[in-house]
Every structure is written in C-alpha cells, then in structure tokens.
C-alpha cells in the first residue's frame, strides 16, 4: 500500500450538525432588526454570509462610528448589492453586477484591508478604496441586519437615512466574522429559520430529517438502518453486501475539500472488472480547475475533472481515450451552486463502414450535468472491459498532474456530495465510506464532512515592476507540476523563477563556473516562455503562437516527468525535453513570483532569462496558483509578507491612464496594466513620472566614472540609454568591458556621430547614428540588443543591425564612462570624453544616480557632479611672445578642432600649421573676433566668427572648427556658427609643426594672405582637441618659448570704483560681483541699461498698481527712485496711498518745474523739495527719495542731497501735529491709543495703491518715466509684463522691451547687448568698403524705409497732433563741422526715452514711407544694407552692401525683426555683414534702427498723415518733399566695463554731437567738460534751443551741454550739396574697387593697423599698454573721415 494511503483515524462528531448557525428569516416588517456584537473592521477583517431574497430594495447591513464620519452600509438597490462606506469622511460606493432578487442563495463577503474594501458576490469581486488622512475606520456601534432600531437617536447615526430605508425580506444565514461566528445580541420581528437544522441533513442512509422542540430528528423507517441518525446497519453480509442498499435508501453524504485533501479507496483486494457501470455525484465550488474523480492507471482509466469551469471526462479502455467536455450555456459550473453529474457506460452494438463485423460490440458513454446537458460517444475498437486494481481517488490525488489522462494538475476545492460508483455487481458509496472511516477508505488531509464555504483563491495584482512574492521551495525532483492563471496588458515581465545550489564555486567572481539548475517562466514581447536547466544546458520554449498580453485571463499548466514535460497555455500543449541525461531538477532556493528582490547577491541569474537581465518585473494579475496539485493562497502570503505594490484583487481600469498627462518634462507616456509607464529617456529626468532630475556628471578629459561589478556578468539582452552634451567630436560615452575577454559594448563619439561597437569575442559589429552631435546641446542615445539583433537610436535617428556568428552572450565586469581604463583587449582606445553625461541607465539601473546616492559601493569616480563649466588642462601664455609647438595636425580629409580660450587682448595667433605648397591652416584672434583662415590649394579663404561682441572679455569661450567630407567648413564660437562650402581641392596637406599661441622668429614676415595678426596670443588656452587627439600642451610640446604655465588664474573680478555705473552699488561675491541697480532707474549687470520706460501723452495717463487686500504692507522706511524727462511745470509722477480713510501717502511731483516729495504718515504733510534747479528741461534726470520714520532725503541725479528732519521729537509734539487733522470726538481715544502703543507716527500704514502719471489727481504728468523702483517693486517692469494687479488707462505707451521684474530685489541680471535700449543715437563714419569674396549674404531686414519729414513724427495719435495744413518743406542733411574742443575719448551709452510731442523743440522720431523710399531710390540715393535687393542694388555685381550712408537711431518703440545677426567686423558692430571701416555704434534693440528729429511747433507746418516708423537714410533734396532735421547723438564708449557687456573699442572722438538727456559716464570730476559742445543747423522757422543756466551747473558726470543754433538757408544748402557730391564719389570709388578686385580670394588692405583694445576690463592681470587719452582727444580727424549725421 502506498504511503499516501496509510490509515488515518477520523472521528465523526455528529454534534457538528447541531453547531451550525441558525438562519434568520426577515419578514420585511417595519421596525425589524437583528443586532450582533460589533465587527472590528477598522483595519483588516472579513465578513461573510449567505442570503436569498425576492425584493429589489432593502437595507441588509449597517454600522457606524456613532454619528461622526465613518460608516458602512450594505443594501439592495435596483436588485443589486450596493456597498457604501466612509473612512475619515472620505466616502465611496461599490455596486455588484449581478441581480440578487431571484430567490436563490447567494454568498456575499465584505473584506476590509486598511483603506481598501472588497465586495464579493458569488465569487465576483469589486474593489475600491479611499484616500483620507486617517488610515483606519472607526467603529462604535454594533452590527445591524435587516434594519435599524427606530429608537436610536438620529443624531447618533452617521448616516441618518439608514433608518428610512426599506427593511430586508428574506433569509440570511452563516454570518461570520472571519472564521468566527458572531454573538447575536437581540432581534425584533425576526424569526429563526428552524429548518436550518435540516438544511444540511444529519440523517444518513436516506433518513428524513424533521424538527421538534428546536432539535433535529431522523426517520429511519425506510432505510434499513437504526440509530438517531440512521447510521447503524441492521445486518451485514460479506464482501460488498453491506454497501448495497435498497432503492429507497438514498444516502446523502458530503465532504469539503480545500485543495490539499482527498480520499482514496483501495481496490487491490476486490479489483473491478466491468463492461457497464455508472458514476453519480454532486459538486459545488468556486474553483475553475480541479480533479473530481479518478480510477485506473496506464491505459485503462476513468478521469472526471473540472477544467476552466467545464466538466471534463476522459475514459480509456486500452486502445485510445474517449474525451468529452460539457459546458453550460451561460456562465461556468464553478458558480458555488450544486450541480449533478451522471456518467454511464453500456455495451451496445455498433455498426459502421470499415468494420469487419457488422454488429460488433462497443461501449456507449453518456455524461450529463444537471440532467439536461448530455454528451454521448463510443469508445474505440472492441475494448469493453474496465479493469482496475489500483485506487479510486476522490477530490484529488498525491500527484494529479501524473495521473494518466488528467487534463488538470490541481486538486478539487469545494464540496462533493454522494459520490457513488456502481456496476452490475457492486455499489461503492464512496462519500459514505469515507465518512464512516471504512478500513479500505484512506483519508488525506483534514476533511470536514459537511459543506463549508470554500472561498475562491483570490487573485492578486502586482502593481509595480518592483513587487514580488517569495514562496517556499518547490520540492520537485523527478516529477512536478505548476498551474496558474495570469492576466496583463504589458508585454514583458518575469512571472516565476527558482534555482538550485551552485555546482561549482571555484571562482566566486565569475558566473561562468557557477552553474545551477533553474526553472523560470517569463513574458517577453507578449509571448510566454518556459526556461529550464537541469544541469546540462538551458532550454527556452516558446509556449504561445499569439501574444497573450491582451488583458484577459490565460491558464497555464506545466507538468514535468523527468526530462520531458508539457506546458499548456489555454489548452494549447507544447512538449519540451531538457538537455542532457539528468532527470532530477535540483532546486533549493525560494520560488519567486512576479519578480526578483533588489538584493540578488545569492542569485545566479541565467543569461537566457532576459527579463531578469533587463529588470522587467511582472505587472498584472495572478490567480489559482497550484504547485504539485496543491493550492497556494497567494493573497494570504502577500498579506503575511506585507509586500508593497501588491493588491488582493484584480480589476482592469477601463479609462486610459495616459489621459491625465501624468508624465512630466516631455516624458513619453505608455499604457500599462492599470498604470501609466513614463519613458524618461532623453528628458534628463527619471522616477515614475519623470519629475526627478537626473544627476549630471561633468568630464574634463581626465575624469571618469567606473562601476565595478561584484561578479562577472553575462547577458544576452541589454537596454542602455543616456544623455550627453559635448562640443567634442570624439570621446568615450560609455563602455561595458571585461577583465577576462575582449567582449565589449561601447558608445563613443566619432567625428561628430555616435558610434556603437559590440564585440562578443568574434569581432566587433559597428553602427553609426546621429549627425553633428558635438553642438553643445543635449542628445539622447538608446541601445537595444536582443540576442543577435541590435538597434542604436540617437535622438530621432535609428540604425539597426544583426550580429554575425552564433555568439549572443556578452561578458562584462565594468561599466565605464569618460575614459576607457580596460584597454588590455582593445585594439584602439577612444579619446577621453569632455562634456556632460546624464541619465546613464544600463538594464534598468541608473548608475550615475546610484553612484551619487551611495547605492552601490563598487563605484570609482573623479568626474564632478553638476552642470559645471568644463575647462580641461588650462595653460596660460603670459606674454605675447610665448608659444609652443606640437606634432603636425592630422587633418587630411576631415577635421574637428576644439579649444577654449580666455583673454583680454584683442589680437593674437592661436593655431598655425603650414603644409605642402600653399596649404595651411590658421586660427587667430582679430579685434576680439575669431578668424579661421585656410588654404586647400584653391587660394586662401577666411571664415569670421559672428559673435555678438568681442571675445577679449576675460571670459572662457568655446571654439569648434570642422571640415566634413563634402568640404563644408564650419566655425562655431560659443553658440553662433558660420559655414562655407569650398569647391575644388578637398585635402589639407600639412607638414611641419603645429604652432600654438604664436609663431617662431621671423615667421610673421612670411605669413599667407588673409592672415592678419603680427603677434602671439596672450591669455589662457584649454580643452585642446586636435581631430580626436587630446594633447597635453606642456608635456606633449616639441618645443616651448616664453612664459607658459599650467592653470589659468586670470584677471580678478573684485569690486572697483567703476564696476557699477550710474551710482549702482557693487556687491562683492565669492567669484564675482553684482550691481544693485534698484535706486538708479537703470538695469543690467553694470547698471548701464535703461529700465522699463513709458511715455505719458498730453491726454494724461495712469498706471495703477493695487496690492491684494491680504498683502498690503506697512513700512517704517521707504525707498523710491525713478528716471524721467519732461518739460511740464506741474504734474504728479508717482503717488503711493494707504487704504481708504487712513490718509497716509507719499507723492513725488513737479511744482513750478522743480521736483518735490510730499508725504504724510499720520501727522501733517511734510515736503522735501529740490529748490535750486528746475528739472523740466527735457533732459533725463533720476530722482531718489528715502524715508526713515519722519526723516527723509531727496536727491536729483548727483546733485546735493536735500534732507528733512522732524521738528519735534517727543510724543506730545507729534500728537499735537497730528491733532489738527483728528476730529474732536476722536481726539481722546487716539491720544490714549498712541500712549498705549507708544506709536510715534512713523509708520506708513496699510499701503494699498501706487499711482503713476497723476491723471487720477487732475495733475497729469506728461513725458517719460523710466525704471521706477519702490520698496522692491519695479512697477513699470511689472506693467510691461502685464502683471494682473496693474491697470493702465489713458495715453500711456511702452517704449521698447524691458528687463524682467521677476526678481525685484535683484537688478544684477541684464539682457544681452543686442536687446539693450541703451544707445539712443547712432553715428556713421563715411568711408570706403573693403569687401571679401565668397561670404554668405547677411540676413537683414528688408523693409523699405527713408526719411520723410512731411508726415507725422510718431505713430501714436494719442500722443501728438498731426496737422497737414502746411505745404512745402525740404530735406535737410546737416553737415558736421569739426570743432577743436577737447573731448574725452571715452563715453558711455545713454538711456533715452522719446519726449512728448507737445513740448518745446526737442529730439523726436522721423518716420518714413515706402513710397518715399522708392522716390529716393529712383533719384540715385546711395544703397543701404538694411534695404532689400529689389530696392537696393549697387550694380557692382557682388553681394556686398555698398558704401552708402547709414543713419540710424532710437524711436517710438515700434517692434522690428530681432533676428538680425550682428557682424564680427573689427570696426562695424551691426547687422551689416563684412563691411569694414564703418562705425555704426547703435542699439540693436528689436532689430529696429530709428532716428530723432525736432518736433514741429504750431507755427510751423505739420505733416498730414502718419506713416510707419522705419530706418533713415540721407538723400539729396527732392521737389515737394517735406523734411526735418535730425539731431544725432553719439554715445561715448565706457571706461573699464566688466567683461562681455559692452563693445570695448576705442572710438575716435567726434565733435558736434547732441547727447540726450543723461550720459552714463562715471567720471566723478564735475569740473571737466563731459562731452562736446554741440552746434546743430535747424530750420529757420524753429526757434533756438532752450537756454542754459550761466555758469557751472551741477550736471551729472559726463553730461554734455546741448546748444542749438539757428542756421541760415545758405549753410543748409551747402551741406546738402556737399553730401550729394561725396556720395557720388564714394559710389564711383566702390565700383572701381570692385572691378579691380582679386577673384581668387578676399580683398585685403595690408596697410590697415589693428589696434589693441584700449578699454580693458576691471582688474586684469595682464594689460595692454594704454594709448594716451590726451593725445587721442586732441588729434583732429582726417578730412577723408568726414562724418554726416541726421
């Protein structure tokens, strides 16, 4: 007898039937209820019961927390169960799908699990959860069934509506709290269901049950048995006689099976031999699969099972199996209802074609379920006898998967009743024999002989890829089985994995020698795979043809016997056979379900298991896990292990998860299983929603990061992704390398492309992707390898390939970045990387972030975290005579050069290498701009960097020079690049040494054409990359000369006297300084850019800022500053008011032309006034006001400070001052309050509004306001940005763009120079043009603009009147008259705001029309570079811009195209490309160039209509063309301005220039003339300029006196004629130069002198010799440099 059938002592306690809980019958009467002891559902607990009813609406169950928040209500609404509950006032509802008003029994369960609650009805579960602050439910009341007592106060109910709900009508039974029966405390209008004792009949052998006096009695009269329960036989006969019963004695015996129980009847003593037989039984279960009954072995057996909710029958009588499947019409048989099965087999005569005998005997097999569903068939051939001498298994077996013909591998779970086998000779009542413990019946497990509820094996959901369960060891050696159901929509995931002990531990560092047995099931790309290794090699079996990640349940059944086995997925069977001869699967470790733990030190993962290598955990549902036929309650295991990310239910959310746009920072959202999956590759972020910024590593060529693996890793699949930023064309990004082999997976930069090298030991495979990725921008790289297939993606560029050979395994022990350290097996080593790396992810592991956070210990690192400025191996050349030599530059076919430099010198050689013939390459610095000169045999060519400003600003700059296979040369300086395609020769033949930073003796005299510098480079060079070679400038030098040192300290950046302009305050910081410009009205890093500027027109305007009610400040001190320009005598500039009825205010206004501030802080009006000088002179002034309590100061520009101090200091004097304004009845309360609070009337209370413009006070201001600052608020900036708290009304117009006001307390950040509005007027020096061939045409604005003074001088009709009543007029071009006045050679840019049109004659805007331009062009006006080609053609055949006058200025704030690229020409810093020897010093604000002209008064003629504001050119007089004169202003260059903020050039002094209101020179000596005295020819109808005050005035530093003089008509005509004649001469000269130019190269003026920049930066360590200021100012310009201004 097998050991599994050893006898077990089973005691049947008949009293068990009497312990059944009584059912309750609810009649539906008003006031009915049943009350049970409180159910503790606060955190985790289950409640279950059975019920049946016929009504559609009723209260079933209720409890709460006594009237506060928490409650649980189960009711029937619309014939469906509805669960409504609340935790901490967070409420939700669950409704079942099934109707329950069918008078059938239903089983309901309520499961509480912290915030999650599950409602299960007949096996179908619905789940929901709430998210309150409290994590548990409070329960105070008892549990009420069927209704709520009416005497309970409504206020004591959390849900008072429960009292009004219809009462329940029906029966509720088997109420249980978990495994316990609750105590019933009382009931009303509810009766016990007395028949409940007989529901499970305790009478055996067909006895009938009846109730009397509350007890059950059995009627045994018709059974042939006696005893209380009809269990005592009257007589017994040998053999099977005691089992044969009369037809009337219908036995009804039941047993409960839970997956591990079964019983078997031993047939060895009485074998079965029958030709006809019958099997009957009843079953009730929730389970989908399970063995019901089996007898026989080998090829002679009967198997009855439940398979996927259907009944399966397999009969084999020796020659082949007869199989039948019975399925219900609707639903499944696993519905926890009783179903009856009957199987019969009878001998029948069967005739058919092909049979030798016509009437041959066959067995007719019939199976029926519930007496309705019937399937009939015949067994094969003539085997008619069933012979069995084995066992009769009921409910299961020791190894169900090994039973012959078994379609399932797990045992039955549920109830089996009246299992009977009978044939012609015997009747085996198997259920009864088990219950009475017949000696031949052997029981396995704890079998209960009554039908108990066996809950279904609840599914669990793995919600994250990191969640997993650890199950006990799978004890399988030779045979075993595993079955489960899974459901997911995700394509990848590890479902099962377990392994054995290592067979060999000779080398713990290598996986190769640690061979272990393992078993795994994985989902890969939607297909299911079985992996098995029994010691002789791994097999990988694909078990599906179609993808199974479709979101529906799939059943998997795996059965193994020795080396062979079958995996079945949804009944599709796939056989497999393990390698080798071994038949033992030796497993020792845990069986992991859903994934693997983070700590895998004890795991030896097979390379063939790709999901483990790639860290793909399973996300989805698992249910019905059976191991060797025994169920595993994985829900209970999950709760016991308390694993995060696992939920004890399974439901699919119908809504798309990506609809919520949950992936931040441009992450790509993908649909997962009840989750969204964010692909953060290429975003620079990581984490679940791409919200966590990935760490950045900065590499300077000597830095690296190396992750050393604890063991040698072998993989067949890799996922690698990273981001990088670099200006280098070569360098190692990452490499997986091995210490033991040549295996590698390497990503590197190669000639500006990304190169992937994969070597698996049989030679490298190479892929390229991306183009010109060395652009100092972020690029994302992704590598995917699956076996032999590899894919490389760089941004949107994709390259795919396939590995050659049979090798698919990659061996590596390191992951390296920056520098390749494992070079033993590398044939060539890549260049070291210089740049930034971010987001390196290798097979799911973020190595950079793990290294930073200390999550891995085996990380070698010297690269620096953070986005750091990379300066690699800097070297300082301390003198212009210092230089060194390197080996010849290898750049024959292509070239990629990179270096960084930092200098204060404007000129010098950087690189030079000569070659064969005329070939050479030179990189030089000319006037602060990079020049790249080369000759490939076609003649010299030049590329000039187009930087915004000179580069000798003591800042690091990056230079990239490339030449590709198409002979396209590119020069990139910082972020700006220029390119040129050169035809002809493509190879660069270089020989000799590469000179760095200078040339050797006597080499400057023999330089090629277009090479300019005649001296060496003085400054710092770093990060030199010569076509992938990273030289050490010191150690690799072939020779050196002069003072050369490592490192680069550079000039200091400490605060100097002139660090901040316009009285800005210099703030010293650790490595730099910043300027506080808050009280200057200026902005920018040096306080020399204008602030936000508004023009208030004659109609009056108002800008109103209102504080939010809850943010109104009260201050003891105030600071106010604003710049303005006006001619009015009275008006309010700014007024700050307190809340209504308080009366506090501060008002800045003009009275009688003088600035005054009046304020009141609760006493009397206090005024501070500038009494000496009027400010309504049309000039730009800055007024500063400060208050501290009652003390106040007022200062205009840098004039003397006006101060005010209170006359009284005591509280009484202050109160007496305030008493004059306090009503009599409030005097005493106020006095008491003042004494109590010790408040001395120094607080400006509850400030509510800031009013600008005075229009609300009937004292409108007219003019310009700029850079208003008040207590940290830049109100005008805020207005320009459209702040929500600011309202603008009336005639108010914004001028141009403004700096941001987002950081009102900091004014140290300025816009780029091209966005500055500092330059007001522009000056143009008329000179010849030297053009250079083969340059790209400049991108310029092509509007057709010309001066037309006969129209309105502004486009704002609200600001001025325009009357065209006057006719006539003439175009005036004032001729500049040289004046020998001593003028300082340095001036600064001046902020300007156009003045209102109603003032006295001051500078204003000249406008143009397209028509006027056409007239001018036809009249032969010189062409300007900002005109289009259609209207501007100099007919010289080249694409230069001509040599016309360019007159430009600043005007009305009209928005123009700002995309005009500035040139890098030595003397020309505007958008007119490659034009030399011109000076156009201007603001490129918004790309618009505007000019200024006098404003006509009423007595003069006025234009008729407005036109567009445009650019201005000078033309000869035209008939009937009305005109006006423009007063030019030339800003003076600034002395010693910190790096990069101004054009640091020496500008020749030009006399007769009008300087607008406030210059920004900071020469503190006010006795020196601050600029030239100006004469300006005007129209005779315009009066003289405003007179100036005699004597020496207190003027701002650097200010210029403006003197306007009337000119006669004769002088004006002379000027016009002179200008016209000069223009014609210039045009002829330009045509001559063009016709005689050198066709093979650019024209070069060899006689030009390149003067070093004299405006050095603050604190430079090495400075050029400064030219004499005095000499420069006294020298008269030559006649050929006459200048014309409009």
Curated annotation (Swiss-Prot):
InterPro entries reported for this sequence: ConA-like_dom_sf, EGF-like_dom, Laminin_G, Neurexin-like, Neurexin-related_CASP
Keyword ATP-binding found: no
Amino acids binding Ca(2+): 300, 317, 380
Disulfide bonds: 198-209, 203-218, 220-230, 415-451, 621-650, 658-669, 663-678, 680-690, 1020-1048, 1055-1066, 1060-1075, 1077-1087
Bias-annotated ranges (Polar residues): 1336-1346
PROSITE patterns: EGF_3, LAM_G_DOMAIN
Identification of the protein by name: Neurexin-3b
Lineage per the UniProt record: Eukaryota, Metazoa, Chordata, Craniata, Vertebrata
Gene assigned in the entry: nrxn3b
């Amino acid at each position: 007898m097998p050991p599994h059938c050893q006898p077990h002592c089973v005691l049947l306690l008949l009293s068990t039937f009497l312990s059944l809980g009584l059912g309750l019958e609810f009649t539906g009467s008003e006031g009915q209820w049943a009350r049970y002891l409180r159910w503790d559902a606060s955190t985790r607990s289950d409640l279950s019961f059975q019920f049946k009813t016929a009504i559609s609406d009723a209260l079933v169950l209720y409890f709460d927390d006594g009237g506060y928040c928490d409650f649980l209500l189960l009711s029937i609404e619309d014939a469906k169960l509805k669960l409504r509950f609340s935790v901490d006032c967070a409420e939700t509802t669950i409704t079942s799908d099934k109707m329950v008003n069918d008078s059938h029994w239903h089983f309901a369960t309520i499961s509480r699990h912290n915030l999650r609650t599950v409602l299960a009805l007949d096996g179908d579960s619905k789940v929901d959860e709430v998210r309150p602050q409290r994590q548990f439910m409070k329960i105070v009341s008892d549990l009420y069934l069927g209704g709520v007592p009416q005497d309970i106060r409504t206020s004591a109910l959390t849900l008072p509506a429960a009292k009004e709900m219809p009462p329940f009508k029906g029966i509720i039974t088997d109420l249980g709290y978990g495994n316990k029966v609750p105590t019933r405390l009382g009931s009303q209008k509810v009766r016990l269901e007395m028949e409940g004792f007989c529901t499970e009949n305790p009478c055996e052998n067909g006895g009938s049950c009846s109730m009397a006096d509350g007890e059950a009695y059995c009627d045994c009269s018709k059974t042939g048995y006696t005893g209380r329960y009809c269990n005592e036989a009257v007589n017994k006969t040998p053999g099977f006689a005691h089992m044969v019963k009369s037809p009337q004695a219908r036995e009804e015996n039941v047993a409960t099976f839970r997956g591990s129980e079964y019983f078997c009847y031993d047939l060895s003593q009485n074998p079965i031999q029958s030709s006809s037989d019958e099997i009957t039984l009843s079953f009730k279960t929730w389970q989908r699969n399970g063995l019901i009954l089996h007898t026989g072995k080998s090829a002679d057996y009967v198997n009855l099972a439940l398979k996927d909710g259907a009944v399966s029958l397999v009969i084999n009588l020796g020659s082949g199996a007869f199989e039948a499947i019975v399925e219900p019409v609707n639903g499944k048989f696993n519905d926890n209802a009783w179903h009856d099965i009957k199987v019969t087999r009878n001998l029948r005569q069967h005739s058919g074609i092909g049979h030798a005998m016509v009437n041959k005997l066959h067995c007719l097999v019939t199976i029926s379920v519930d007496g309705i569903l019937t399937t009939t068939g015949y067994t094969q051939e003539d085997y008619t006898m069933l012979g069995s001498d084995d066992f009769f298994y009921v409910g299961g077996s020791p190894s169900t998967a090994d039973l012959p013909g078994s379609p399932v591998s797990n045992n039955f779970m549920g109830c089996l009743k009246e299992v009977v086998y009978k044939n012609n000779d015997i009747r085996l009542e198997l259920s009864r024999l088990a219950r009475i413990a017949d000696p031949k019946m052997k029981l396995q497990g704890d079998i209960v002989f009554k039908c108990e509820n066996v809950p279904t094996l609840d599914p669990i959901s793995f919600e994250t890829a990191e969640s997993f369960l650890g199950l006990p060891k799978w004890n399988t050696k030779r045979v075993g089985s595993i079955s489960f159901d899974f459901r997911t929509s995700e394509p990848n995931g590890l479902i099962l994995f377990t392994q054995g002990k290592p067979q060999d531990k000779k080398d713990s560092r290598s996986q190769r020698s640690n061979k272990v047995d393992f078993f795994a099931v994985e989902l890969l790309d939607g297909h299911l795979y079985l992996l098995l290794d029994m010691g002789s090699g791994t097999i990988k079996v694909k078990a599906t043809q179609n993808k199974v990640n479709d979101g529906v349940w799939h059943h998997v059944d795996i059965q193994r016997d020795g080396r062979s086995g079958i995996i079945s997925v949804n009944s599709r069977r796939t056989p497999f056979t393990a390698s080798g001869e071994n038949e033992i699967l030796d497993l020792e470790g845990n069986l992991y379900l859903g994934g693997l733990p983070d700590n895998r030190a004890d795991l030896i993962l097979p390379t063939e298991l790709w999901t483990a290598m790639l860290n793909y955990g399973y996300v989805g549902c698992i249910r019905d896990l059976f191991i060797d036929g025994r169920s595993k309650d994985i829900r209970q295991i999950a709760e016991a292990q308390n694993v995060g990310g696992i939920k004890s239910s399974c439901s699919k959310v119908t809504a798309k998860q990506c609809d919520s746009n949950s992936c931040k920072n441009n992450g790509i959202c993908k649909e997962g299983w009840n989750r969204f999956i964010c692909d953060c590759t290429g975003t620079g972020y990581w984490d679940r929603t791409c919200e966590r910024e990935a760490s950045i590593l900065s590499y300077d060529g000597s830095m690296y990061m190396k992750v050393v693996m604890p063991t040698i890793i072998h993989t067949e699949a890799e996922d690698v992704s990273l981001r990088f930023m670099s200006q280098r064309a070569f360098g190692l990004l990452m490499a997986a390398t091995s210490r033991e082999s040549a295996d590698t997976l390497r990503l590197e930069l190669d000639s500006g492309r990304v190169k992937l090298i994969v070597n698996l030991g049989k030679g490298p495979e190479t892929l390229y992707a991306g183009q010109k990725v060395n652009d100092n921008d972020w690029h994302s790289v992704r590598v995917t390898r699956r076996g032999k297939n590899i894919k490389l993606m760089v941004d949107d560029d994709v390259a795919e390939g396939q590995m050659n050979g049979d090798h698919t395994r990659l061996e590596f022990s390191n992951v390296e970045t920056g520098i390749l350290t494992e070079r033993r097996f590398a044939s060539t080593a890549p260049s070291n990387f210089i740049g930034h790396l971010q987001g390196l992810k290798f097979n799911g592991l973020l190595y950079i972030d793990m290294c930073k956070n200390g999550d891995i210990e085996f990380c070698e690192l010297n690269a620096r975290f953070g986005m750091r400025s990379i300066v690699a191996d800097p070297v300082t050349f301390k003198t212009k005579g210092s230089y060194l030599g390197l080996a010849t530059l290898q750049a024959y076919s292509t070239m990629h050069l990179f270096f960084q430099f930092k200098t204060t010198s404007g000129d010098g050689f950087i690189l030079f290498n000569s070659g064969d013939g005329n070939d050479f390459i030179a990189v030089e610095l000319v006037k602060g701009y990079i020049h790249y000169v080369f000759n490939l045999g076609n003649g010299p060519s030049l590329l000039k960097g187009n930087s915004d400003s000179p580069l000798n600003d003591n800042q690091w700059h990056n230079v990239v020079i490339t030449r590709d296979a198409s002979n396209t040369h590119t020069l990139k300086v910082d972020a700006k690049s220029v390119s040129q395609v050169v035809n002809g020769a493509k190879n660069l033949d270089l020989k000799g040494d590469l000179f760095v930073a200078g040339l050797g003796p006597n080499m400057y005299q023999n330089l090629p054409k277009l090479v300019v510098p005649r001296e060496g480079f003085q400054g710092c060079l770093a990060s030199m990359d010569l076509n992938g070679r990273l030289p050490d400038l010191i150690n690799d030098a072939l020779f050196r000369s002069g003072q050369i040192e490592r490192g680069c300290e550079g000039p200091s950046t400490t605060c100097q006297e002139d660090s901040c302009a316009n009285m800005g305050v210099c703030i010293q910081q650790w490595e730099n300084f910043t300027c506080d410009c808050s009280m200057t009205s200026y902005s920018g890093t040096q306080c020399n850019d204008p602030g936000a500027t508004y023009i208030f027109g004659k109609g009056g305007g108002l800008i109103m800022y209102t504080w939010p009610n809850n943010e109104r400040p009260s201050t003891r001190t105030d600071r106010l500053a604003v710049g303005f320009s006006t001619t009015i005598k009275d008006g309010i500039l700014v007024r700050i008011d307190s809340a209504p009825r308080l009366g506090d205010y501060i008002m800045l206004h003009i009275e009688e032309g003088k600035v005054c501030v009046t304020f009141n802080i609760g006493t009397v009006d206090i005024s501070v006034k500038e009494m000496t000088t009027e400010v309504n002179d049309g000039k730009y002034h800055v007024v500063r006001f400060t208050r501290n309590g009652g003390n106040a100061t007022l200062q205009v520009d840098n004039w003397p400070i006006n101060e005010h101090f209170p006359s009284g200091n005591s509280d009484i004097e202050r109160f007496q001052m305030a008493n004059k304004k306090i009503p009599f009845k409030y005097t005493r309360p106020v006095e008491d309050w003042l004494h109590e609070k010790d408040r001395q009337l120094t607080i400006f209370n509850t400030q509510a509004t800031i009013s600008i413009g005075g229009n609300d006070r009937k004292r409108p201001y007219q003019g310009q306001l700029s850079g208003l600052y008040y207590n940290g608020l830049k109100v005008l900036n805020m207005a320009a940005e459209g702040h929500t708290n600011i309202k603008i009304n009336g005639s108010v117009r914004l001028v141009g763009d403004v700096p941001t006001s987002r950081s009102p307390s900091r004014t140290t950040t300025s816009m780029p120079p091209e966005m500055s509005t500092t330059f007001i007027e522009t000056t143009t020096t008329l000179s010849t043009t030297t053009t250079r061939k083969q340059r790209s045409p400049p991108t310029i604005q092509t509007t057709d603009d010309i001066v037309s003074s006969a129209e309105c001088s502004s486009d704002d009709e609200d600001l001025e009147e325009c009357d065209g009543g006057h006719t006539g007029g003439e175009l005036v071009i004032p001729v500049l008259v040289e004046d020998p006045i001593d003028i300082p050679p340095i001036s600064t840019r001046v902020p300007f705001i156009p003045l209102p049109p109603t003032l006295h004659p001051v500078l204003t805007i000249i406008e143009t029309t397209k028509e006027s331009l056409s007239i001018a062009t036809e009249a032969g006006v010189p062409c300007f570079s900002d005109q289009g080609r259609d209207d501007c053609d100099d007919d010289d055949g080249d694409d230069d811009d001509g040599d016309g006058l360019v007159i430009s200025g600043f005007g009305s704030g009209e928005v123009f195209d700002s995309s005009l690229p500035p040139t890098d020409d030595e003397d020309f810093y505007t958008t007119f490309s490659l034009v030399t020897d011109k000076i156009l010093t201007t603001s490129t604000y918004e790309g618009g160039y505007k000019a200024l002209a006098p404003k006509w008064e009423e007595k003069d003629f006025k234009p008729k209509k407005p036109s567009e504001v445009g650019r201005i050119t000078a033309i000869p007089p035209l008939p009937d063309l009305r005109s006006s004169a423009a007063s030019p202003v030339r800003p003076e260059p600034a002395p010693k301005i910190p790096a990069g903020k101004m054009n640091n050039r020496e500008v020749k002094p030009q006399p007769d220039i009008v300087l607008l209101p406030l210059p920004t020179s900071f020469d503190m000596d006010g006795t020196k003339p601050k600029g030239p005295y100006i004469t300006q020819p005007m129209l005779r109808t315009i009066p003289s300029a405003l007179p100036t005050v005699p004597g020496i005035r207190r003027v701002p530093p650097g200010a210029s006196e403006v003197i306007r003089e009337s000119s006669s008509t004769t002088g004006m005509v002379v000027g016009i004629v002179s200008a016209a004649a000069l223009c014609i001469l210039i045009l002829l000269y330009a045509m001559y130069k063009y016709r005689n130019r050198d066709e093979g190269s650019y024209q070069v003026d060899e006689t030009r002198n390149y003067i070093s920049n004299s405006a050095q930066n603050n604190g430079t360590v090495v400075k050029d010799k400064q030219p004499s200021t005095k000499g420069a100012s006294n020298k008269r310009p030559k006649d050929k440099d006459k200048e014309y201004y409009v």
